[in-house]
Amino acid sequence: PADDYVEKRLDVSEFLIDHHDATFFVNIQGQSMVDVGLLPGDKVVVDRSKTPRMGDIVLAVVDQEFTIKIFDYGANKMPRLMPANSSGAYRPIYIRPDMQFEIFGVVTGSFRRFK
């Protein structure tokens, strides 16, 4: 029967948020992260308490502008922020010493509404 496939009620906050005091939501703008399923209008969950690791999707501030990208290190061991869009329309952001750079939080989830 269909009841066998119904899970318990889901508390969305409990599911999406690990640290309530350090978590907030950001709207996705642009298409630089579509290959990882982040589409314009989606909301991402950002946790400021998590330590960013290579390969994490992060919310970063680069020269006073926010961006969501994949945190990585280039061949020169300098940090870079990688887009996830195979169209070639977006380039990595290579962080130079003269740039203002801060990882503002780690993206831990996302969600969207259909209607």
Predicted regions and their residues:
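Acidic/glycine-rich C-terminal interaction modules and beta/coil loop segments
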Residues: P1-V12, L16-K115
